[in-house]
Amino acid sequence: MKLEHPDRLMNRTPLSLAALETHDAFAERHIGPDAASQQAMLDTLGFASRAALIDAVIPASIRRAETLPLGPFAQPKSEAEALAALRALADKNQVFRSYIGQGYHDTHTPAVILRNVLENPAWYTAYTPYQPEISQGRLEALLNFQQMVADLTGLAISNASLLDEATAAAEAMTLLQRTGKPKSNVFYVADDVLPQTLEVIRTRALPIGIEVKTGPAADAAQANAFGVLLQYPGVNGDVRDYRALTEAIHAAGGHVVVAADLLALTVLTPPGEWGADVAVGNTQRFGVPMGFGGPHAAYMAVRDEFKRQMPGRLVGVTVDAQGKPALRLALQTREQHIRREKATSNVCTAQALLAIMASMYAVYHGPHGLKTIALRVNRIAALFAAGVKQLGFATVNDTFFDTLTIDTGARTAQVHEFAKAKRINLRRVSATQVGVSVDETTTRDDLADLLDVFAQAAGGTAPAVDALDAGLAGVAALPAGLERTSAYLTHHVFNRHHSETEMLRYLRSLSDKDLALDRSMIPLGSCTMKLNATSEMLPVTWPEFGRIHPFAPAEQTVGYREMIDQLEQMLVAATGYAAVSLQPNAGSQGEYAGLLIIHAYHASRGEGHRDVCLIPASAHGTNPASAHMAGMKVVVVACDAQGNVDIADLKAKAEQHSKDLAAIMITYPSTHGVFEQNVREICEIVHAHGGQVYVDGANMNAMVGLTAPGQFGGDVSHLNLHKTFCIPHGGGGPGVGPVAVGAHLAKFLPNQRSTGYARTEDGIGAVSAAPYGSASILPISWMYIAMMGAKNLTAATETAILNANYIAKRLAPHYPVLYSGPGGLVAHECILDLRPIKETSGISVDDVAKRLMDYGFHAPTMSFPVPGTLMVEPTESESQEELDRFIAAMIAIREEIRAVEEGRADREDNPLRHAPHTAAVVTANEWPHAYSREQAAYPVASLGTNKYWPPVGRADNAYGDRNLFCSCVPMSDYA
């Protein structure tokens, strides 16, 4: 309910408690325009109500008849109520000390990083840094990440993160397939690789015809493989010398991928120094909580010859318009939004926020601090090994960094029983072996407890830690010949910010350079940059969610699994499908999973030959990239002059490929920002030819509560929880990409059999390293839905559509709106056509994007889905005041363009061509331009009270790609 204005309450009979309870208060905070503003915008559009507008925008044939069936979450909860309800679920989890290892370790997040990065909206509400001039802070943090990874792995170049270690290993496999031994389709995986990694590799390999072989690492050179994956150290703790093996693999024409533990590499010889071609791994133990599996930033580092084949983001150094160093995303032509089915990967969002945390962990500790942590971890492992041997147990591995595998024989069950009594988790290697992985958080008291567990099982007394320590004095605990001797993290950034004062100021200096949602709206079309409310973010840092190992026993994760089940049902209600899996940890992975599910469905019906995927020409680049990865052949369907799917062309191609048609991938509303009237017909055509309908859920923010893909003909969709359901973009990740399916596809949802998570017997293999993907950020979406309730979720969708149409209407006299539906209306976004301006003035869409920075705005999406256009999506969270500020900026820019068109301003020397303008340029002694300094920096009066200064001038992208440099910049370059 809405509260009446306090002034109107003063002279009335006291209201009841029910009338005063503010369950809807959060919705009023989340939805930007108040009732008066909404009515004013509706008046501008010529509609009496929001309902009338929605009736005109959305085809009646697909309108949802019923209210969102959210069950117990239909009524909104207040922020306090939602937090209390989620706290009750969190309290059902049991936080044990987990020494399971297997790629996940407990860690200490330095408080200065927790408060000033993870909990700071300046970092977590930013977008992927496609606009480099207003992204220099996070680009520098990601460049630090790349430098950290390259240094620790001993390889030439690293990317700016991948989704998790398992998918990074799978990406390495396909990288080597593209570049490696031409006559082999074999990828060899050593038998001590993490089991979840092997499962994801098998999932990825099957549809593209790669044969995965496994066996002892020693046999790899004889496998005739184009690539070999080694684990360093191995899952059971062994640290092996792979130098001779690597030489033999190279001699046989293969390449070597090493999955390496970065903390171990501070004390072990790095893979790059013994011949590895690619290194992959996880940076989770660099200050990022386990979080029941994620999100965490994986990495990939490669030899120089592979740099142009790497997947994911790559930050590079270039110069700006004044010749000063500037950072930007390099080699973007590798990526799916440009190369589509020929891209190096379908990865779009990665794990930027977590990569930034990991890089700052290295900055804070520095090389000496990291090595001290590593040596302490290794020392504890050595003392544990000595202690269990004294108790009569044998260790399977004699070499180790942090992990021991113990032969426990008939006493295995007792060991686990005694460990459970002390709230300790150990790895269940087999019926006769137990694994123990210690970490940064392991103390001498923890070590004493571990030893006591084994002592109880042995019927003896645990040796004292101090006595063990004294007995091992002078004894090297690392394997002989593999101690690291090379320097790392020598750049000044890793050797300066070690006091909290310095670290705090460094983080502040970086965040001040960037433009995120905490400063202004980010009207990126197809990106849904909406409010990420603080109350939604709070539970992410609760230890009951953060300190849970993804492979912890089920009885310890009851609350997590209840929350996940509830969220899945919420998404079922929103989409109209029958079932949802939250395992995919990005939209790209949900999309890929959906296509594998379609293939599994066809195969189950004896139609595994169906491999043609129809994709409209307007589709997002991930669609064809994912289809290619899923082993499908992409056939493009034309769009008509209004931007809709060309029905005649669709019918012709569906008929042509009828016997082999697997699916069509459509986006709804379309990527042109319109509710296509004939979407049901599209679905019926494909179904008539035996295909399945994949509805890309990127634009779900225009559908929640009003229509549903599962009700108008969709068979499968992925969603973007980092768009519609309020998980923040984090500067380029994390994201969550659930896959939602109809009842006939539910049994094919992804499993993770290697770790005991089998959802259904017929499910596809794992698409992420952890059973529930990025589980620790799922509470964000749970909180959002719980606080909004059914009615307000629908109101949010309606307001997003209202805001988009208001912008389109106000800007149409200045910039043509390229596509619209009946009545000239759009969905939740609109495309502004700047191509005529280019013809009349020479001003490009890039010039307008850069000029918006001077006005304090991040540009809308550039040149997608149509080159030379801007796609604007305001979301429901922006107030009319902010919308009007953006509209005023766009109109002012149009007047600046008109001055060029009319000859009042020079075609080259004008504010657009030289944008953005830095404070250094505006305040310099020399001002060489015909326009004034005031016009450059303060083109509208509102900037006088709230001015954002871009830290660099326009970045030279071509220079950066010609002179590729992806490491930290020497201080001298900034002089």
Swiss-Prot record:
The keyword Transmembrane does not apply. Its cofactor is pyridoxal 5'-phosphate. One of its GO terms (cellular component) is glycine cleavage complex. Keywords: Oxidoreductase, Pyridoxal phosphate. It is an enzyme of class 1 (oxidoreductase). SUPFAM superfamilies: PLP-dependent transferases (SSF53383). InterPro entries: GcvP (IPR003437), GDC-P_C (IPR049316), GDC-P_N (IPR049315), GDC_P (IPR020581), PyrdxlP-dep_Trfase (IPR015424), PyrdxlP-dep_Trfase_major (IPR015421), PyrdxlP-dep_Trfase_small (IPR015422). The modification N6-(pyridoxal phosphate)lysine is found at K723. It comes from the Bacteria. The keyword Metal-binding does not apply. Belongs to the GcvP family. The glycine cleavage system catalyzes the degradation of glycine. The P protein binds the alpha-amino group of glycine through its pyridoxal phosphate cofactor; CO(2) is released and the remaining methylamine moiety is then transferred to the lipoamide cofactor of the H protein. This is Glycine dehydrogenase (decarboxylating). The lineage of its organism: Bacteria, Pseudomonadati, Pseudomonadota, Betaproteobacteria, Burkholderiales. The gene is gcvP.
